[in-house]
From Swiss-Prot:
This is Chaperonin GroEL 1. One of its GO terms (molecular function) is unfolded protein binding. NCBIfam families: GroEL (TIGR02348), PRK00013.1 (NF000592), PRK12849.1 (NF009487), PRK12850.1 (NF009488), PRK12851.1 (NF009489). The gene is groEL1. The keyword Cell division does not apply.
Length: 541
């Protein structure tokens, strides 16, 4: 395909236009008084959301340079969402502010590489201050406050706090749709490990890109499976039982994988294959954990079991299995309670006897998966559109609360960035264009608070000036319009969210500033007419 190339200021401004279009659509959602955005879907009802990354994903632009600019900012939102589970809108607003200030300085003749270095040093200094000012979460109420802000609903916040209290920070919290109106919390025994489906052909829910198996058999094999003959016996027995099958093995490839996929596509037999978690001895131990939890056995030649001879009695079972591209969750494994308790006691003893911090950490993870269980939050709503939006908010709030437990909290509402910045810049000594780069960060960190104030109908400049004069931790509670001690009022953000937002925004801003050329696909002017050729050469007949 032919390419078009833009250079210098034209290239950077094209990227900036794309960034601005996307950021302007996303930033209306920031803060307690932020608005929603309606997203049209090709199929089904439209989605209403205030989640930055969901909005960003839906935006596709015509202009090739603008499209690339928008894609770069999508990456900021996505990366922040992946790491912290929230803060996507803050990251987008910060990226827009950093790029705007940065490009102004590049146009005025500043050296882009020096600006980038200055931005990186300033961001590092601000993050150090953020981490130093972080307060560890100690109570259930603090978790509830953090989750409530993310979800915009105190009821959701307190439910998430209760769920985290029950399963611990290593436990798993999932969100399911409910037929009843309102919210309920259900605790189920379960386990999650970080391996997803081997092939996307196994997906049963295309929108969420996950495979859901109800009441499946679970085949656990400590070796590779490539020959379909090994699987035939067990597949026939499972198919006769009319149940789906989860296969956990070192790897599944070749004709064995192809057979499973073909049967899934034809609708003959529902299954999903995932790789076993871990490596070496740790893999063996984790497979044994899964076997005990599900009431199955690990099929391994070491213990004299061969796959081709396996019957249903060697397979585990569970109420439900959910597999995404990255992880597998087994809910309500049918294992014997005494055996599970024995395994938990054995792992606890290993933790006590272990000298290695790394081994202890890995054993602790295994213990949490066996003993922690899974908390299921069931959400209901009046309409499908509202249900989708509510479910999404709860999922974000869960990740937000976990981030808060992990690294602590800081004052919310964009205040922590400004106050950490004030301390960081007082001690930062840079020269020349690096100092200019640091100044870009100094200006940009005001942007989230300004946007929160703007969305609340207040004058952004006045609010920022007022906050600068307040004691540390005090700021604007945009929900009430009152200036107060934000942590005491329960207005807080996980430091992990704020830190990730600033880091990712600065990373992309540095790329924008140092870009000198953009190569894009040339837009096609005349798309071919639908339905075949234009009868060229037929003299109009």
């Amino acid at each position: 395909m032919a390419k078009i190339i833009a250079f210098d200021e034209e290239a950077r401004r094209g990227l900036e236009r794309g960034l601005n279009i996307l950021a302007d659509a996303v930033k209306v959602t920031l803060g307690p008084r932020g608005r929603n955005v309606v997203l049209e879907k090709k199929w089904g009802a439209p989605t209403i959301t205030n989640d930055g990354v969901s909005i960003a994903k839906e935006i596709e632009l015509d202009d090739p340079y603008e499209k690339i600019g928008a894609e770069l900012v999508k990456e900021v939102a996505k990366k922040t969402d992946d790491v912290a589970g929230d803060g996507t809108t803050t990251a987008t607003v910060l990226a827009q502010a950093l790029v705007k200030e940065g490009l102004r300085n590049v146009a005025a003749g500043a050296d882009p590489l020096s600006l980038k270095r200055g931005i990186e040093k300033a961001v590092e200094a601000v993050i150090s201050e953020l981490l130093a000012s972080a307060k560890e979460i100690e109570t259930k109420e603090e978790i509830a406050a953090t989750a409530s802000i993310s979800a915009g609903d105190p009821e959701i916040g307190s439910l998430i706090a209760e769920a985290l209290d029950k399963v611990g920070k290593e436990g798993v919290i999932t969100v399911e749709e409910s037929n009843t109106f309102g919210l309920e919390l259900e605790l189920t025994e379960g386990m999650r490990f970080d391996k997803g489906y081997i092939s996307a052909y196994f997906v049963t829910d295309a929108e969420r890109q996950e495979t859901v198996l109800e009441d499946p058999y679970i085949l656990i094999v400590n070796s590779k499976i490539s020959n379909v003959k090994e699987l035939v016996t067990v597949l026939e027995k499972v198919m006769q039982s009319n149940k789906p099958l989860l296969i956990i093995a070192e790897d599944i490839e070749g004709e064995a994988l192809a057979t499973l996929i073909v049967n899934k596509i034809r609708g003959t037999f529902k299954s999903v294959a995932v790789k076993a978690p871990g490596f070496g001895d740790r893999r063996k131990a984790q497979l044994a954990d899964i076997a005990i939890l599900t009431g199955g056995q690990v099929i391994s030649e070491e213990v004299g079991l061969k796959l081709e001879n396996a019957g249903l009695e060697l397979l585990g079972t569970a109420r439900k299995v959910v597999v995404t591209k990255d992880e597998t969750t087994i809910v309500e494994g049918a294992g014997d309670a005494e055996q599970i308790a024995g395994r938990v006691a054995q792992i606890r003893a290993e933790i006590e006897n272990s000298d290695s911090d790394y081994d202890r950490e890995k054993l602790q993870e295994r213990l949490a998966k066996l003993a922690g269980g899974v908390a299921v939050i069931k959400a209901g709503a009046a309409t499908e559109v509202e249900l989708k939006e509510r479910k999404h908010r709860i999922e974000d709030a869960v990740r937000n609360a976990k981030a808060a437990v992990e690294e602590g909290i800081v004052a919310g509402g964009g205040v922590a960035l400004i106050q950490a910045g004030a301390k960081a810049f007082a001690n930062l000594t840079l020269q020349g264009d690096e100092a200019t780069g640091a100044n870009i960060v100094k200006v940009a960190i005001d942007a989230p608070l300004k946007q929160i104030a703007f969305n609340a109908g207040l004058e952004p400049g006045v609010v920022v000036d007022k906050v600068r004069g307040l004691p540390s931790g005090h700021g604007l509670n945009a929900a009430t319009g009152v200036y107060e001690d934000l942590l005491a009022a329960g207005v807080n953000d996980p430091v992990k969210v704020t830190r990730s937002a600033l880091q990712n925004a600065a990373s992309i801003a540095g790329l924008f500033l140092t870009t000198e050329a953009v190569v894009a696909d040339k837009p096609e002017k005349n798309a071919p007419a639908p339905g075949g050729d234009d009868m060229g050469g037929m003299g109009g007949f």
